[in-house]
UniProtKB/Swiss-Prot annotation:
Family statement drawn from the similarity comment of this UniProt entry: Belongs to the type II topoisomerase GyrA/ParC subunit family.
HAMAP family noted in UniProt: GyrA
Gene it is expressed from: gyrA
Gene3D superfamilies assigned to the protein according to its UniProt record, in alphabetical order: 3.30.1360.40, DNA gyrase/topoisomerase IV, subunit A, C-terminal (2.120.10.90), Topoisomerase II, domain 5 (3.90.199.10), Topoisomerase, domain 3 (1.10.268.10)
Domain of life: Bacteria
Protein name per its UniProtKB record: DNA gyrase subunit A
Reaction(s) this enzyme catalyzes, per UniProt: ATP-dependent breakage, passage and rejoining of double-stranded DNA
Molecular function per GO: ATP binding; DNA binding; DNA negative supercoiling activity
UniProt lineage: Bacteria, Bacillati, Bacillota, Bacilli, Lactobacillales
Length: 828
C-alpha cells in the first residue's frame, strides 16, 4: 500500500525552489540591513526587545543572558549566541561609530579578544539608541506578527537619525554581501539636510558636507576618487592607512609609533605578522615590537635598528602588513523588500522618504489623539453648561444605561461623551474646573489646527525633520576621527620600499652584473696593491663600473646601438667576491649583444639635455634625451650602426659642451658638440675623429678649460694634464698625442676629464679593484709617460675605470661580515 504521507517530487525543481526560499530568507530576514533604519532584523529585535524590557539608559544594567533570552523567546528564534554576538558588537567602540548598547563588563577588545559569557556581562540601551525607537508607540511604523504569532514586532524602526550611514553595515548573504562604512553623525545629518534643501545636488556637492567615511578607529583615508566612485555607484574601494609617527629616542635611534589602526584590523595579528616577517628576514631593521596601549589610547611601538631607515621600513610595513588595508564599498541594502546596491544619494532619499512617513504618521496619531480628547472635552463643556438638567436626568434614571441614553438624546452627544459625563467626578463641577476644561479645549483646537496644517504642507514636514535632526546633532555629534588625505593614494612603488643608498654597479666581460654597497671600498694611497673587488673567474673581468644610487634609473647602451633601462635596486646585491647575475636574466639581449656603457639618468639632471654617442670607428651623434622616455622591455634603437662598427660610449651633454675623444694608440681630438645637429634615434651620425690604421676609440668625455684630462694605460700608468693643453678644433681630425705610448706603459685604456677632487676606481682583467684619489696621480704634459698608479700581477691589464665621490679615509676597510652574509644569502 502506498504511504499517503510520501509525495513524489522532481529533485531538480525542489532544489531550485527550496534554495531560492532559503536564499531569500537569509537575504531579507537575516543578513542585510534595511535602508530606512540601517538595521538587520537581529539588531532591530535586540533594540526593540531591550526597549520593551525597560533596559533604557535611565535604568540599571540588566544581565545579557536575560536580554538575549527574552529576544530569542519572543522575536529571534535562531540561537542565543548569534543574538549575543550582535549585541556585543553594538557595544564595542571600535566596531560602531556610535554604540547602540551600553555594555558593562568584558565586551572584548580590538586585539580580537572575545567578550565574556553572557551570564557575566550586563547591558542596557545607549542614549542615542533611544533616537532609533523614539515615537515607535505613535503608530509611526508598521508591526508584524513574530515567528509564532504570539507577539508583535516592528517591521522597521522610526530611526530619527540616518543609522545606515552613521554606523554602516557588514553582512554576507547567499550570493551577495554588503559592506557599508560608518560616517560622522554631524556630516550625515548635514548631507540629509542638503538633499532636502537642494534636491538637485550632485554627488560632488554632497561630498562637500560628507567628504568620506569616519571610522571609529580613526586612521587615514588615502585619496578621494574611490570615495566619489562609491558614493556615485554604490561600489568602490579606498585605502586605509594607520596613523603613525616616527620618533627619535635620546640615543638617536628611530622608532615607529602607531596610534590608530585601520577599521577592522586586529592589533595582535599585526604584532604577530611583523614579528614573523622580521624572523623570516623578509623585513630587516626591526629590533623590537611592543604594544603599549592603555586606557589613554592605542600606542603600538616598532623599534628600529640604528643604521636602518624608519621611512623605508614603514613603507614596507604598509605594503606587507595590515597597517594599510583596502576597504571595499558594496552598499547593498533592502529597499522595498528587495536587495539593491544603492548610491549615497539613494540611501539619503530612502531615509528622507522614511522620515516623511514617520512624521506624517506621528502627526496623524497626535491629531487623532487630540481630536478624541477635544471631543470628550466638548461633551463635558456641554454638560457643565446644562448642569442642573444633566443632574436631573442622571437622578431620575434607574440605570446608568438609561442615563447615558437620555443624555445622548437630549444634548446630541456621542456614546463616549455621554460616558465621560457619567464618569466625571463631582469636584469637576466647580467653576474653576470648568475654566480648566475650557482652556484645555482651546489648546487642543489650536493643536489640531497646527497638526492639520503640518499634514497639508510638505514643507513643514521637511522643517520638522531638519529641526529634530539638528537637536540630535547637538546632543550626540562629535569630531571626525578619520582624516581624509588630500590627493590620490600613492601606490607603494618598489623604490618606496628600498632604502636609498650609494652603490656600485659592476658588469663583467661575460655579462655578470651585481650591486655592491659603495662603502665596501675605501681609498688607498697611490701604488697600493688593492683588494679583490669582484668574483670573476680567471677568464673573465669587469668591463663596466658605475657609481649610482639605488633609486636611480640606469640606461644600458649596447654594442648593437640599442638601449635598455633598469632601476639600480632591480639589480641584485651580492658580496664583493660573488660573481653576480647574468645580465640576460634582467635584460632581453639579442645573441652577441653586450652592454658597452651604463649611464645614470636621473630625471632632474636630464631635462633638456642630449645623449652624445661615440662609436668604435669614430662616428658621433647627438640625440635629445626626451626621445628615450619610453623604453620598451625589449629595448629601443639608440642609433644606426655601420657594418662592423660598435657603440662604445654615451655622454649626457647640454648641447654646447666641448667633447674630447681618446684613441687606443694615444691620440685625442677636442671639438664643440654644437657643430653636430641633433639627430633622431634611427640616424647613423657623423665622423668625430679620423682614426689611424689599427686604431680605435677608447673613451670620450665632456671637457672644460678648468678641468684636467686623466688618461690611464693598460700597464697601470696614469697622468693628469691640463685641459688647456688640448686645443678645440673641428671634428673629424686625426687628433694630437695625449700620451707617450711605449711597451712599458702600454696602450691607452681610457680617457676622462676630472677636476682633481674625485676618487677613481681602476679595474683589471683579473677582477682586482683599486680606489685612489685623483689628486694622488701626478700632473704632467700631454705627450708623457705618466706614473705608476697600480701594481699589476703578471698578465694583468687595466680594462676600465670610473670616477666616484671622494672619501676621507685612506685605509682600505672591508666589512667581511656583511660580505659573507650577503654572499651566502645570494649563493644559496
Amino acid at each position: 500500500m502506498q504511504d499517503r504521507n510520501l509525495i513524489d517530487v522532481n529533485l531538480t525543481s525542489e532544489m531550485k525552489t527550496s534554495f531560492i526560499d532559503y536564499a531569500m530568507s537569509v537575504i531579507v530576514a537575516r543578513a542585510l540591513p534595511d535602508v530606512r533604519d540601517g538595521l538587520k532584523p537581529v539588531h532591530r529585535r535586540i533594540l526593540y526587545g531591550m526597549n520593551e524590557l525597560g533596559v533604557t539608559p535611565d535604568k540599571p544594567h540588566k544581565k545579557s543572558a536575560r536580554i538575549t533570552g527574552d529576544v530569542m523567546g519572543k522575536y529571534h528564534p535562531h540561537g542565543d549566541s548569534s543574538i549575543y554576538e550582535a549585541m556585543v558588537r553594538m557595544a564595542q567602540w571600535w566596531s560602531y561609530r556610535h554604540m547602540l548598547v551600553d555594555g558593562h563588563g568584558n565586551f572584548g577588545s580590538m586585539d580580537g579578544d572575545g567578550a565574556a559569557a553572557q551570564r557575566y556581562t550586563e547591558a542596557r540601551m545607549s542614549k542615542i539608541a533611544l533616537e532609533l525607537l523614539r515615537d515607535i508607540n505613535k503608530n509611526t511604523v508598521n508591526f508584524q506578527d513574530n515567528y509564532d504569532g504570539s507577539e508583535r514586532e516592528p517591521v522597521v524602526l522610526p530611526a530619527r537619525f540616518p543609522n545606515l550611514l552613521v554606523n554602516g553595515a557588514t553582512g554576507i548573504a547567499v550570493g551577495m554581501a554588503t559592506n557599508i562604512p560608518p560616517h560622522n553623525l554631524a556630516e550625515s545629518i548635514d548631507a540629509v539636510k542638503m538633499v532636502m534643501e537642494h534636491p538637485d545636488c550632485t554627488t560632488r556637492e554632497l561630498m562637500e558636507v560628507i567628504p568620506g567615511p569616519d571610522f571609529p578607529t580613526g586612521a587615514l583615508v588615502m585619496g578621494r576618487s574611490g570615495i566619489h566612485r562609491a558614493y556615485d555607484t554604490g561600489k568602490g574601494s579606498i585605502v586605509l592607512r594607520s596613523r603613525t609617527e616616527i620618533e627619535t629616542t635620546q640615543t638617536g635611534r628611530e622608532r615607529i609609533v602607531v596610534t590608530e589602526f585601520p577599521y577592522g584590523v586586529n592589533k595582535t595579528k599585526v604584532h604577530e605578522h611583523i614579528v614573523r616577517l622580521a624572523q623570516e628576514k623578509r623585513l630587516e631593521g626591526i629590533t623590537a615590537v611592543r604594544d603599549e596601549s592603555s586606557r589613554e589610547g592605542v600606542r603600538f611601538v616598532i623599534e628600529i635598528r640604528r643604521e636602518a631607515s624608519a621611512t623605508v621600513i614603514l613603507n614596507n610595513l604598509f605594503k606587507l602588513t595590515s597597517l594599510q588595508t583596502n576597504f571595499s564599498f558594496n552598499m547593498l541594502a533592502i529597499e522595498n523588500g528587495v536587495p539593491k546596491i544603492l548610491s549615497l544619494r539613494q540611501i539619503i532619499d530612502n531615509y528622507i522618504s522614511h522620515q516623511k512617513e514617520v512624521i506624517i504618521r506621528r502627526t496623524r496619531f497626535d491629531k487623532d489623539k487630540a481630536e478624541a480628547r477635544a471631543h470628550i472635552l466638548e461633551g463635558l463643556l456641554i454638560a457643565l453648561d446644562h448642569l442642573d438638567e444633566v443632574i436631573a436626568i442622571i437622578r431620575n434614571s434607574e440605570t446608568d444605561v438609561i442615563a447615558q441614553t437620555e443624555l445622548m438624546s437630549r444634548f446630541d452627544l456621542s456614546e463616549r461623551q455621554s460616558q465621560a459625563i457619567l464618569d466625571m467626578r463631582l469636584r469637576r463641577l466647580t467653576g474653576l474646573e470648568r475654566d480648566k476644561i475650557q482652556s484645555e479645549y482651546d489648546d487642543l483646537l489650536a493643536l489640531i489646527a497646527d497638526l492639520s496644517d503640518i499634514l497639508a504642507k510638505p514643507e513643514r514636514i521637511i522643517t520638522i525633520i531638519k529641526e529634530e535632526m539638528d537637536e540630535i546633532k547637538r546632543k550626540y555629534a562629535n569630531p571626525r576621527r578619520t582624516e581624509l588625505m588630500v590627493g590620490e593614494v600613492l601606490s607603494l612603488e618598489d623604490e618606496d620600499l628600498i632604502e636609498e643608498e650609494d652603490v656600485l654597479i659592476t658588469l663583467s666581460n661575460k655579462g655578470y652584473i651585481k650591486r655592491l654597497a659603495q662603502d665596501e671600498f675605501r681609498a688607498q694611497k697611490r701604488g697600493g696593491r688593492g683588494v679583490q673587488g669582484t668574483g670573476v673567474n680567471n677568464d673573465d673581468f669587469v668591463r663596466e663600473l658605475i657609481s649610482t644610487s639605488t633609486h636611480d634609473t640606469l640606461l644600458f647602451f649596447t654594442n648593437f646601438g640599442r638601449v635598455y633601462r633598469l632601476k639600480a635596486y632591480e639589480i641584485p646585491e651580492y658580496g664583493r667576491t660573488a660573481k653576480g647575475l647574468p645580465i640576460v636574466n634582467l635584460l632581453k639581449l639579442e645573441d652577441g649583444e653586450t652592454i658597452q656603457t651604463i649611464i645614470n639618468a636621473r630625471k632632474e639632471e636630464t631635462a633638456g639635455k642630449s645623449f652624445f654617442f661615440t662609436t668604435k670607428q669614430g662616428i658621433v651623434k647627438r640625440t635629445e634625451v626626451s626621445e628615450f622616455n619610453n623604453i620598451r622591455q625589449n629595448g629601443l634603437r639608440a642609433l644606426k650602426l655601420k657594418e662592423g662598427d660598435q657603440l662604445i660610449n654615451v655622454l649626457l651633454t647640454s648641447g654646447q659642451d666641448d667633447i674630447i675623444i681618446g684613441t687606443h694608440s694615444g691620440y685625442s681630438v677636442r671639438f664643440n658638440e654644437a657643430s653636430i645637429r641633433n639627430m633622431g634615434r634611427s640616424a647613423t651620425g657623423v665622423r668625430g675623429v679620423k682614426l689611424r690604421e689599427d686604431d680605435r676609440v677608447v673613451g670620450a668625455s665632456r671637457i672644460q678649460d678648468n678641468q684636467e684630462v686623466l688618461v690611464i694605460t693598460e700597464n697601470g700608468f696614469g697622468k693628469r694634464t691640463s685641459a688647456t693643453d688640448y686645443p678645440t678644433k673641428g671634428r673629424g681630425g686625426k687628433g694630437i698625442k695625449t700620451a707617450n705610448i711605449t711597451p712599458k706603459n702600454g696602450q691607452l685604456a681610457g680617457l676622462v676629464t676630472v677636476d682633481g677632487t674625485e676618487d677613481i676606481m681602476v679595474i683589471t682583467n683579473k677582477g682586482v679593484i683599486i680606489r685612489t684619489n685623483v689628486a694622488n696621480i701626478s700632473q704632467t704634459g700631454r705627450a708623457t709617460l705618466g706614473v705608476k698608479i697600480m701594481k699589476l700581477d703578471a698578465d694583468a691589464k687595466i680594462v676600465t675605470f670610473t670616477l666616484v665621490q671622494p672619501e676621507d679615509s685612506s685605509i682600505a676597510e672591508i666589512n667581511t661580515d656583511r660580505e659573507n652574509s650577503i654572499s651566502k644569502n645570494k649563493d644559496n
